């Protein structure tokens, strides 16, 4: 018989901390029921109000959910540091790791020459009264966004795409509000939504992005914000097509109460045209990161949007982090202005496309339908994730289980192709075919 985790504490803070410890250590797993308020109060010799306050704080932080007569349970994706990592099985010794979702370091532009040039040119250290955004960076960013059809009168910078999205959600929403997110979608975003105490509503995805019907359903369920990946959607590789963009803009036009967030994290690597939704709603933001083209360690994203939204994000940053390092801003500006770097990024995008298409073709030759219009990943629907991931691990290949990315979507696995060598394509496809049975064509979601 399983031993029940013993919650302890004599105050609401201590009780909530004890529950969080149980979740973090795995003693309280996803879906585990917490004791009824009065039962736990009697057990701990505290008032029911003290336990109720502890549970309220856990709900606010996205660790637990309350479902009427079903009581209070641990959330399926509680936002604690070890939870998401626990969903990803460790690579077997000597296994080829295709689970991480990172660009190929061999294809990233060299930063050394740009850093050396900055060291020679940079002036005195910037003081606390400096502007948050370098004017020259804002000027180049506006031109680059305008070339893609994104209005960019207002510009600020954040510490990466997720930082920008977090600030946007905090500026417009309150705990308990609903956010429409792609399903399957970016694991970090799903965890962020939970950590903020927001309620995710999954929107089905097909190769052209979030479906119109799915967005309409999410709006009917009360979504206050919608997050859309413009291109290279993680994990499916979807990209918003022109017809889908038109249909979504028409749908969103009558929603003055909705915050629209677009994430164009792939930027120049995407190799398909951008069809933005920017401006479809009064409150909107478009976020473009530099991490995929230039390297994950460059934590900078450009954020544009309506005047009020950008002002909220910039104002909150001023009383928090202050600003994104101007050294980093100057480095990004130098990379943007360098034609040689642009050529390297363009060739990297072409190479990712070639590797992705090679794996998709090899899977198709074995009766398997994978997906990946853009980006560095291939999404493969499977009947059973655990069986597929385990079989591939035993065969020497590590892939990411779809549970990292799903709310209600059908099972699948994500295979990162960014570092996939030509000689590995056929052996990998053979291993995948042996691990899963063929699945028919269709979308990614239930």
Per-segment meaning from a language model:
Residues 1-119, 126, 139, 318-324, ...:
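N-terminal basic, amphipathic alpha-helical segments
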Residues 178, 199, 259, 369, ...:
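Residue-level detector of anion-binding/catalytic polar loops
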Residues 181, 262-263:
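Hydrophobic residues in beta-strands of the RecA-like P-loop NTPase core, especially within AAA+ ATPase
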């Amino acid at each position: 018989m399983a031993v029940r985790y013993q919650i302890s504490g004599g105050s609401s803070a201590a009780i909530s901390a004890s529950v969080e410890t149980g979740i973090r250590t795995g003693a309280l797993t996803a879906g585990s029921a917490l004791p009824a308020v009065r039962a736990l109060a009697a057990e701990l010799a505290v008032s029911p109000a003290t336990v109720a306050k502890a549970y309220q704080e856990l709900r606010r932080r996205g660790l637990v959910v309350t479902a009427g007569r079903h009581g209070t349970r641990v959330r399926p994706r509680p936002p604690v540091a070890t939870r998401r990592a626990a969903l990803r099985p460790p690579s077997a010794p000597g296994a080829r790791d295709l689970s991480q979702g990172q660009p190929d370091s061999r294809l990233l532009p060299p930063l050394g020459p740009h850093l050396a040039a900055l060291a020679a040119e940079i002036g005195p250290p910037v003081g606390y009264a400096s502007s948050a955004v370098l004017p020259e960076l804002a000027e180049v960013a506006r031109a680059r966004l305008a070339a893609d059809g994104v209005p960019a009168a207002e510009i600020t910078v954040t510490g990466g795409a997720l930082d920008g999205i977090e600030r946007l959600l905090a500026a417009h929403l309150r705990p308990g509000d609903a956010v429409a997110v792609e399903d399957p979608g970016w694991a970090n975003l799903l965890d962020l939504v939970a950590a903020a105490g927001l309620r995710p509503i999954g929107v089905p995805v097909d190769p052209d992005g979030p479906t119109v019907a799915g967005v309409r359903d999410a709006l009917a369920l009360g979504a206050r914000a919608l997050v859309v990946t413009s291109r290279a959607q993680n994990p499916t590789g979807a990209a918003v097509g022109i017809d889908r963009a038109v249909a979504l803009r028409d749908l969103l036009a009558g929603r003055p109460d909705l915050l629209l967030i677009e994430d164009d994290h792939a930027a120049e690597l995407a190799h398909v045209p951008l069809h933005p939704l920017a401006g479809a709603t009064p409150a909107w933001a478009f976020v473009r990161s530099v991490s995929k083209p230039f390297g994950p360690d460059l934590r900078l994203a450009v954020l544009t949007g309506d005047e009020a939204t950008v002002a909220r994000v910039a104002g909150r940053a001023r009383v928090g982090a202050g600003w994104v390092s101007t050294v980093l801003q100057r480095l990004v500006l130098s990379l943007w202005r360098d034609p040689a770097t642009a050529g390297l990024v363009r060739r990297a995008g072409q190479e990712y496309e070639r590797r992705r298409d090679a794996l998709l073709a090899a899977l198709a030759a074995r009766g398997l339908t994978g997906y990946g219009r853009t980006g560095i990943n291939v999404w493969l629907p499977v009947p059973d994730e655990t069986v597929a991931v385990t079989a591939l691990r035993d065969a020497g290949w590590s892939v990411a289980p779809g549970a990292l990315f799903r709310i209600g979507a059908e099972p699948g696995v994500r295979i990162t192709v960014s570092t996939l060598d030509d000689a590995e394509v056929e052996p990998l496809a053979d291993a995948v075919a042996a691990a899963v049975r063929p699945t028919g064509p269709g979308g990614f979601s239930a």
